[in-house]
UniProtKB/Swiss-Prot annotation:
The lineage of its organism: Viruses, Duplodnaviria, Heunggongvirae, Peploviricota, Herviviricetes. This is Glycoprotein G. Residues 1-24 form the signal peptide. Glycans are attached at residues 85, 111. Belongs to the alphaherpesvirinae glycoprotein G family. Residues 191-218 are annotated as: Disordered. It comes from Psittacid herpesvirus 1 (isolate Amazon parrot/-/97-0001/1997). Disulfide bonds: none annotated.
Amino acid sequence: MGHSGENVLCVALLAIYLAAGGAAKPVMPERRGYAPPFTAAPSTLGTVDVTACGGITLPTKVDFRGSGGVQVIVRWFFGAPIDDNTTDLCWVPLHSYQADGCHFPADDDFNISTCCAHGTLFVSPDSDYSSYLTGNGDLRVYPGTMDAGIYAFYVRIGDDHFVGAWDLRVKHSKYCHGDYGMKVQVQSLPESSEERVVATDSDSGSCEDDEKEEKSDCEFPEIAVPQTWSKVCTATWGEHGSRLFVWPACLGTHQESIEGAHTAMPVLYYGSKPIASEQK
């Protein structure tokens, strides 16, 4: 009975396993046949924890393999709670990269810089040195203490549209200065500035006036609206580890941003950013 008994036991265990639903399926981005706008944040792919001023990569989990000659659009947004008394979010556009003539390796990682004919990078005036896009569309973010929230993305590959988000929780660190971070910068922007007006055009779905902020109903931006992205940049590619990242030249040189970050972040953290020598 030796082996036959073991086989019966294995079959029985397999039946129980399948009846219970089998292995947990990985959470993947939602695929849509149309372009947003959204009326609410997309479903989150999970919750991630990071220490303030520490780096973390938020992936899109989109499979780029199998097609070619199409346009690729990758956009990321940051949604921060408006106040402690509501679950409403105020959305800030971060990065938008549009690449044309893209071909996707069947068995290799997709990289915008090498797999596409040409591309254009759009950034919001609210963007700063605390985040950047990697070559495959993931978001590398170095959040400040106040930068907990939802980080949502939109990816378009030809006629296919993918949406998803990550819930980022930020742990306090005594080494991370309070005046560093994305939310701090957004809150300090002058409401009367021309760039701020462009970024919060009435069609963009952002917080464009005091009345809307009082109602605490900032909506997810209509990502197809060009006014959401007020700057067009030439993109500089650099390498950090095994990944390429894109740096918007209109925000100044990467070295200048590192030097600016150094005034807000501890020396302990300084070396973890891509260095200027990697910018060629």
